[in-house]
């Protein structure tokens, strides 16, 4: 599970793994099963609930060890957005079997160019939070 959730400016907020670690420390009990990322159960249950097929879907995320690994473990196409902790150098260092199929600087790159044009969007429309 993710230890922290990155925010603009380099700060982070506690995420599932750090909260689990705090509970383990307080209770002196080890968590025996995590159903969060990268465990494929999350995507499998979601896909069943949506009556969707893995081969017609794509998991997009900003973390290699959780988002992309979950997609790979589920057999789903993966897309990495370089807005989180992963960098292009991190992707280049991966073996082919661990590399996401798509890598993009922004999630709106998934929108076809024709739609961008129809909406009058340009790269200048980017807003950084």
Please provide the spans of the model-predicted regions.
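Asp-based, Mg2+/Mn2+-dependent phosphohydrolase catalytic module
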Residues: 1-129
């Amino acid at each position: 599970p993710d230890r922290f959730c990155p925010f603009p400016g380099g700060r982070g907020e506690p995420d599932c793994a750090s909260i689990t670690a705090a509970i383990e420390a307080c209770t002196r009990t080890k968590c025996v099963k995590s159903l969060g990322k990268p465990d494929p159960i999350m995507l499998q249950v979601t896909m069943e609930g949506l009556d969707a097929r893995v081969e017609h879907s794509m998991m997009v995320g900003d973390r290699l060890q959780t988002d992309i690994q979950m997609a790979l473990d589920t057999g789903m196409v993966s897309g990495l957005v370089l807005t989180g902790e992963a960098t292009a150098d991190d992707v280049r260092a991966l073996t082919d079997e661990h590399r996401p199929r798509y890598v993009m600087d922004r999630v709106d790159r998934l929108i076809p160019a024709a739609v961008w044009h129809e909406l009058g969007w340009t790269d200048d429309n980017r807003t950084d939070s």
